[in-house]
Amino acid sequence: MRQFVIDGKTVSDDSPAYVTAEIGHNHGHDIEKAVAMIKSAAGVGADAVKFQTRSPKHTYQASTDRGAFYCRSDNPQWMDQVYGIHREKLEFSWDEWVAVRDEARKEGITFFSTPFDFPSLELLEKLGVPAYKVASGDATNIPLIKAIAETGKPTIISTGGCNIEEVDQLYESFKRINADPKDLAILQCSCVYPATDEAMN
């Protein structure tokens, strides 16, 4: 029987659905909002809350040119900012991440995150997250996938936009390092927002 184990909970064909509340960056770097989202997710019975973790200085070019990399937003908080600066303002400090993790523990809900780069993976390791999620955009980022596999932790990888050869490559790259079948879940992902009913499982 196929099984995936995350934070001590087994997910299989015979188990109830594992529900993850995707918080991402919807907190807008507001710790009180993040805490409220965690409480809400726990209150409705979600199994986990998932965030996104980036190190914008390692991910985005520090360009000040107006144009494609500028935020176009009606929100005065973000209007006319370089995208990298905008992303940086969304990131929590170490102390804030600790507060987020501790709040999830207090509420009895699993906390994990999607690392978008190596510094973020290192930060999440220090926080002691029990699992990782890889975004579709990084499904072909084999160095990052290998680094995550080396943690020995359960990993969920979305494959939106990938062809079957790329899915095979990420699978083989992960399994060469972490061969435990209970540590890898691959999601078929439709990169259409919002997805039509016909595109969903």
Label each residue range with its predicted role.
Residues 1-201:
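Catalytic cores and adjacent flexible loops of soluble metabolic enzymes
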